[in-house]
Amino acid sequence: MFQDEAGFGRINKPKHCWCRKGVRPRVPCHHIRQYRYAYGAVDPVSGDGYFLILPYCNTVCMNIFLEHLSAAYPDDYIILVCDGAAWHKSGSLRVYPNIELMFIPPYTPEMNPIEQIWKELRARGFHNEVFQTLDKVVDRLCNTIRCLTRETIRSITGRSWILSCFN
C-alpha cells in the first residue's frame, strides 16, 4: 500500500469553472488557516483504500493511523510505502508486526500514487468552495472519500510500473 497525508482546510484557491459566455464567475475566497489532515493508504492492485481524518501531521497521529490500519487488516502483511516525512521516521513511531515501512526517495512525490487521490478529492469536493466551519470541511472530506470506489482508486493509482511488479 502507498501512504501519505494531505491537508484540507478553510483556505481555498479559485479554480477554473464553467459559466455563460460573457459572464465573469465570482468565486469567494477564505484565508482562514484551519486544517484537518487526511491520512490515507491505497492499494493500486485491489483498489483498497483506508483513510482517517486527524487534527495534525505528527508522530502521535501517525501512530493512531498505523494502529487503525493494522487493526483493519489483521490477517495481512502490509508493505507501506511512505515519503520521508519526519513523523514517518521518528524514534517514537510504533510500527505494528503486520506492517513494514518502506520509503520513496526524497522529493519524489511522483513515485507515490496516492498523491493523485488527493488531487481527485480536491477536484471533486473542494474547488471554488468556501467552508464556514472546519466541521463542514471534515464533513465534505468524509463524503468525498466515501464516494471513491475501488475501481476509481485502481484507475487513478494503478500505474504500469506498479502493476507490473504483481503480474
What is each stretch, according to the model?
Residues 1-167:
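Short functional hotspots at interaction and active-site rims
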